[in-house]
Amino acid sequence: MSGFKCYLQLGDRLSQIWLNKYTLVLLLAMLKLLFFSKSIQHAIEVSETYILSNCYSIDSLYSKMTDNTPHYLGIMGNYLIEKGMEETVKATLETLSLIVYASEGLVNFAIDLYLGTYACLIVSAVDGTVDVATNTTEKLISLVNDTVSSVANELDTGLNDISKIINKVIKAASKVENFFTGDDDDSNMTSSIKSVNLTISALHNLYIPSSINDKLEELSAKTPDFAQVKNTTKNLISVPFNEVRKNIKAVNASNIIGDTSVLYVPPVSLDNSTGICSSNQSEILAFYSILGQVLKIATVVCITVLICFAVGAMAPVAWNEIKLWRRLCGMRDHYMLSRQDSYTSFSSENTHELKDPFRDPPIQNGQYDVIASYQQCFQTWNTRIAGWMTNLVTFGKSPENIDPKTKQKIEWVVAYMTSERALCVLGIGLLGILVCICQFVMIALLKHKISHSLTSNDGDGVQNLLKSSTAVDIENQMSLWSVQTNKYINTTETNINQEVFGWINTTTLSVNNTVATMISDIDTTLADVFNGTLLYNPMKTVVGCAIENKLYTIEKAMTWIHDKAQLHIPRINGTQIKQALAKQADNSTIPTASSTSAATENLLENLVNDMREGLLKILRAYHRITLGELTVALVILAVWLVQLPIALVILRLRLRKATFD
């Protein structure tokens, strides 16, 4: 036992070089690559089986996509053509109506320019003459009536005074006559003139009656004004134009475009003539066969290379162990030689006593091993595990009663099993078991989810979702397409109205502002010159006939152009397109509406069943693969457990050798 140590010696270390991390990693990579190859091979086989078993479904789906696409494109195209033609006819009719409006406006403007001007001037002359005559007679009547009344009053006053004087003279003459004659006979002249009353009362009743204006006002009332003349002319001219517009509005655009039933719609194909899968079955088999061969060759080559590297990695590891052991032994020898000078003291019996620099308990027989100290210092977990194992084996004994040799044996076995390489194997094994447990949990959850979701009895199952998702997806895509297309149409319409008709709007607004300014300036000038005179109304009427009425017509025309100079592009209604497709499907004479729906439903059911079986088959395959990985992890853990009997065998051999020595 004198040569037995509690730590691993060079031979012990070299016995574990095949457990180095490089070899183990390469071996694990080889196994993982092998499992991966098997997984790929199995997935390829599943894919091959699935494709070959669903050739009819694939052919049917491909046929529906390729053969029936013209049918639905034809329906949508015919609908768009119909709506486009209808909107074109409506736009043409609207254009004709605008042309009629413009023509009527031009005719009215021409009539107003030539005939209207003269008619307006004639009416204005009559109205102006009557107005001047009326104003003149009113002034004259007022002047005459006021003057005659004043003169009559003044004459009455003068005549009254003269009458009083004459009466006084008559009275005096009568008295003189009576004095001289004394005759009371009243037959003479003086008796006949009692008094004199001079008056002009009849002159008070002299006046010019106001009824003299009635004839003039009656003439003015009977004379038509320009507005009446203009309205009468416009009404006569608008008769044919209104008739044309009425006929245009009565036109039905839907009747003009003709019978849309003559538009051809490609029929729905009922057969699966486009057999993209069944017609290429031999090529599919050959392709999968080539894939399998390539996979096998690549797997063999890679595994061979990995094995060579794994074996080759042992040589540098062994060489490193030898060099490390030599350094450790050199360190120990150097320490043993140097301790005589640094760490010795002489007792009374001239025996050497070792000064332990790590403050360890005194070692019997005066032996101190620096490698043991190194292991205790730098491999603390090994030392702790060794202490736990010693306490477990010697349960119930105090540390002082434990045999040092037994303790050394336990520490050596623990050191052998907890070496860096052995712990690496243990860690890999435990990690592999943990990964396998996680994989089993995931597989169980996936199986439960697949079995629960891919059932036809579940109302929220994938099968029902697939049945309803087609229509929903078409409707959503149609709505999205119509919205995006309408956005494009809105942008285009705005750009056209701004870029093409923008200058028209700017011009019409500028012309209207100019016309309004001109009319305001003309009215201001007339008011400044003729306001308060008899010529103001006639001049205003003449200027209105000759200039302002034309300006108002131009302003009205510019406003009409401003309102009409805009492009309105019809929008796309996704709901109408969907209704047209549904109507076409209802009116179709081809018996594919119900049969296609039933076939599609059966096809979806078959696809769901195949999908469920395929997924479960793949999960079962990965379950088997996970079992294989768990087996490998358990084998790795067993390799670590094998280190215990190996350590016991080595320990027994050394003990026997020490006994023989």
Swiss-Prot record:
Membrane-crossing residue ranges in chain numbering: 17-37, 106-126, 297-317, 425-445, 630-650
Principal location: membrane
Induction: By pheromones during mating, through the regulation by the STE12 transcription factor. Also induced in respiratory-deficient cells.
Cytoplasmic compartment segments: 38-105, 318-424, 651-661
Glycosylation, residue list: N135, N145, N188, N197, N231, N252, N272, N280, N490, N505, N512, N531, N573, N587
A cellular component annotation (GO) from this entry: mating projection tip
Topology in the lipid bilayer: Multi-pass membrane protein
Keywords: Cell membrane, Conjugation, Glycoprotein, Membrane, Transmembrane, Transmembrane helix
Regions of this protein lying in the Extracellular compartment: 1-16, 127-296, 446-629
GO biological process: plasma membrane fusion involved in cytogamy
Entry's localization field: Cell membrane
Record flagged with keyword Membrane: yes
Annotated family: Belongs to the PRM1 family.
Known role: Involved in cell fusion during mating by stabilizing the plasma membrane fusion event.
Record-linked PANTHER family: PLASMA MEMBRANE FUSION PROTEIN PRM1
Protein name: Plasma membrane fusion protein PRM1
Gene that this polypeptide is encoded by: PRM1
